[in-house]
């Protein structure tokens, strides 16, 4: 079916009162960013809905992009026809040939904003319904809960037909809740946490700790590609690569084995807070799930959080692993996440880390390292990459990977 327009309906934006205009403007901008490479597409936001004019662009490709734009409740692909009954019948016939199977029921639902159009809604419903029945004798009209509702919108600039309502991603437009810093490892949990934060309107920057030669180029490429998966929900994301080798080596050399993980996490948090202050971040996000590993007990969280007063948000904190995995599969990050490349959270991991670290002991052992000097040198080596939706990094490194095998 060659559709001419897609009508986008809003979700929670209807509750935003005086801020509604700003939310709609942000959503319009996010839709533009998502559809940037479709040069002929036009986006027209207004108070109640946004109209995406296709101008010959493949509707299926645009629909696949719109499904990942947060702030959209649902949308409908539409066919624009001339303002004559003959044109409406021809368009409806084409649409029903594709969608109305034998035995299915239907109804016509007409809205007429152009009151100068001669045919009123009742007449349109009756005449168009009769026309479809004549052409599809194996089908019946059903006014309540039909299989297909053919909607007819009579506007000043034409008549628009649609019979599909496609669910959107819901949530709030990315950017309406401010900026957050996502501590992105290569695992299953942190991409899901990033996705959930973005769904609540957070513009997320991905912070990844990289420890060569202990972590490989494959691990870095995997983290970048995971960021590309998440960028599909915002158009693009900033990927911040933070060198962490010296810090890990120093902690391993000077601190007790049981406290390695706790002190490493404190240093990570300090670095992310510093980046947030530089870049306008309002909160730190991570993929911690309570009790899942040693660093995710409440005692560990208390000892780690001690280094900052900035909010730390854990979107998956109360989820079971299977719940997190289900979301990871839905957003297409799971297969990437389980690729067996070590990240900096797994190297130097002690066999028996403290699950209930003492805060005072943590502070005492941490005094053995030059915290400020280590932070300064790490921040000096930060690299930032703008990553577009679904951008591929694993294939770019195929030759490097082959040499390592």
Swiss-Prot record:
- Record flagged with keyword 4Fe-4S: no
Which pathway does UniProt place it in? Cofactor biosynthesis; thiamine diphosphate biosynthesis
Q: THUMP domain location, by residue?
A: 60-165
* Keywords assigned by UniProt, alphabetized: ATP-binding, Cytoplasm, Nucleotide-binding, RNA-binding, Thiamine biosynthesis, Transferase, tRNA-binding
Give all cystine bridges in this chain. none
Protein origin, superkingdom:
Bacteria
Q: Where is the signal peptide?
A: none
The protein's matches in Gene3D superfamilies, at most eight in alphabetical order, are given as: 3.30.2130.30, HUPs
Q: Which Pfam families match?
A: ThiI, ThiI_fer, THUMP
GO MF, one example? tRNA-uracil-4 sulfurtransferase activity
Name the major location: cytoplasm
**Entry EC number(s):** 2.8.1.4
Q: Where, per UniProt, does this protein localize?
A: Cytoplasm
Catalysed reaction equations from the record:
[ThiI sulfur-carrier protein]-S-sulfanyl-L-cysteine + a uridine in tRNA + 2 reduced [2Fe-2S]-[ferredoxin] + ATP + H(+) = [ThiI sulfur-carrier protein]-L-cysteine + a 4-thiouridine in tRNA + 2 oxidized [2Fe-2S]-[ferredoxin] + AMP + diphosphate; [ThiS sulfur-carrier protein]-C-terminal Gly-Gly-AMP + S-sulfanyl-L-cysteinyl-[cysteine desulfurase] + AH2 = [ThiS sulfur-carrier protein]-C-terminal-Gly-aminoethanethioate + L-cysteinyl-[cysteine desulfurase] + A + AMP + 2 H(+)
Amino acids binding ATP: 183-184, 208-209, 265, 287, 296
One example of a Gene Ontology biological process annotation: thiamine diphosphate biosynthetic process
Q: Which GO terms describe its cellular component?
A: cytosol
Q: Which InterPro entries match?
A: Rossmann-like_a/b/a_fold, ThiI_AANH, ThiI_fer, ThiI_N, THUMP_dom, THUMP_ThiI, tRNA_STrfase, tRNA_sulfurtransferase_ThiI
Q: Which family does it belong to?
A: Belongs to the ThiI family.
Task: Describe the task this protein carries out.
Answer: Catalyzes the ATP-dependent transfer of a sulfur to tRNA to produce 4-thiouridine in position 8 of tRNAs, which functions as a near-UV photosensor. Also catalyzes the transfer of sulfur to the sulfur carrier protein ThiS, forming ThiS-thiocarboxylate. This is a step in the synthesis of thiazole, in the thiamine biosynthesis pathway. The sulfur is donated as persulfide by IscS.
Query: What is the name listed in the Swiss-Prot or TrEMBL entry for this protein?
Result: Probable tRNA sulfurtransferase
Q: Which organism is it from?
A: Pediococcus pentosaceus (strain ATCC 25745 / CCUG 21536 / LMG 10740 / 183-1w)
